[in-house]
Amino acid sequence: MSSGALFPSLVSGSRSSSSKYLVEFRAGKMTLKGSTVTPDKRKGTVYIQQTDDSLIHFCWKDRTSGNVEDDLIIFPDDCEFKRVNQCTTGRVYVLKFKAGSKRLFFWMQEPKTDKDDEYCRKVNEYLNNPPMPGALGSGGGGGHELSALGEGGLQSLLGNMSHNQLMQLIGPTGLGGLGALAGPGLASLLGSGGPATSSSTSSSRSQSAAATPSSGSAARLSSTQAPTTPVTPAATSSGSPTVTPTTPAAQTPSLPAGPASSTQPIQLSDLQSILATMNVPAMPTEGSGVDLASVLTPDVMAPILANPEVQQRLLPYLPSGESLPQSAEEIQNTLTSPQFQQAMSMFSSALASGQLGPLMNQFGLPSEAVDAANKGDVEAFAKAMEGSDSKTDDGDSKDKKDDDEDMSLD
């Protein structure tokens, strides 16, 4: 359930040329083993980047090899970047996630200390208050590059999106991000239709919301002195922060979807219709609208998530990675995260608008669910999905019974 960027790979060099670093400074990684943190002596760079899909990435790369080893998608209020005052042998900073006990440590490699506080302030500012799309000048707006695709290129893009990429259209960064892009670039493209250009490949680079494992290359000594003492409770009198087993930063989960329809891809007119209303709150037709986030509360979900069968069905949709264990506890952490609750609210609003029918049809959902999505009836949509699930279970039971009968005939 990794978060794949929707558009970067479609315009040559879009991810690097159109997304400048918001802040960058030289810093090395620190390796966490148990409750001990030891410095990785390679020369590195920490930087924050806003990509064309409006997501904020916190990255660390090896300055010698140029390899980006850590690329985390960060949402506002996910984490805090601050100095570890308990460490007196070096300028150590920690990226501390608020959901769980996950911490990533770095040690400053800038030769001068006069800008340390400024770097720390900027990191927190951009992580928790990301700039609006297009606010970074000509280099930061993805809408202009979408316009360069033309109608033919964008149509090709929509037809080749994977399920996870399509799900971003109904996630917090999808609806909000595309709605914002619709202003300067995408709206003009959809309104007038730009000149068709040849489409590029549609394989998009998957960005994990967790740090990737460090490479096994030999560590290179930095010209700046590394902290000589591991950050441990025994090493300092004041004690360093105790680091417990890591948990992932909360991210927007991809909702389980049915098999992709093998018929027609999403049409450009469908996306135009969706974008036209996604930033306008839907007016309830009868009574008050249903907010799934207020219905699927942790108390309601707890007994459901305790079912081992449900857990096994949800585990494949969890993020994967060395520091991201796929367990029942992680299911609970994901579904109770603020990002998931926000995604549920956004999905409810989008579903109530009656504009998600084409997307639901693309996911291969039953006709009852598609009809409910076209009508903006959240309750009917939920019942249709529940009925579809029951039919699937009945079908599986019937198939198993037929198999048993065939075996008895043998």
Curated annotation (Swiss-Prot):
Residues 281-395 form the DEUBAD domain. Residues 17-130 form the Pru domain. InterPro entries: DEUBAD_dom (IPR044867), Rpn13/ADRM1 (IPR006773), Rpn13/ADRM1_Pru (IPR044868), Rpn13/ADRM1_Pru_sf (IPR038633), RPN13_DEUBAD (IPR032368), RPN13_DEUBAD_sf (IPR038108). It comes from the Eukaryota. Pfam families: Rpn13_ADRM1_Pru (PF04683), RPN13_C (PF16550). One of its GO terms (cellular component) is cytoplasm. Keywords: Cytoplasm, Nucleus, Phosphoprotein, Proteasome. Residues 381-401 have a biased composition (Basic and acidic residues). Residues 191-264, 381-410 are annotated as: Disordered. GO terms for biological process: proteasome assembly. Belongs to the ADRM1 family. Residues 191-257 have a biased composition (Low complexity). One of its GO terms (molecular function) is proteasome binding. It is found in: Cytoplasm; Nucleus. Gene3D superfamilies: 1.10.2020.20, Proteasomal ubiquitin receptor Rpn13/ADRM1. Component of the 19S proteasome regulatory particle complex. The 26S proteasome consists of a 20S core particle (CP) and two 19S regulatory subunits (RP). The lineage of its organism: Eukaryota, Metazoa, Chordata, Craniata, Vertebrata. This is Proteasomal ubiquitin receptor ADRM1. Component of the 26S proteasome, a multiprotein complex involved in the ATP-dependent degradation of ubiquitinated proteins. This complex plays a key role in the maintenance of protein homeostasis by removing misfolded or damaged proteins, which could impair cellular functions, and by removing proteins whose functions are no longer required. Therefore, the proteasome participates in numerous cellular processes, including cell cycle progression, apoptosis, or DNA damage repair. Within the complex, functions as a proteasomal ubiquitin receptor. The modification Phosphoserine is found at S18.
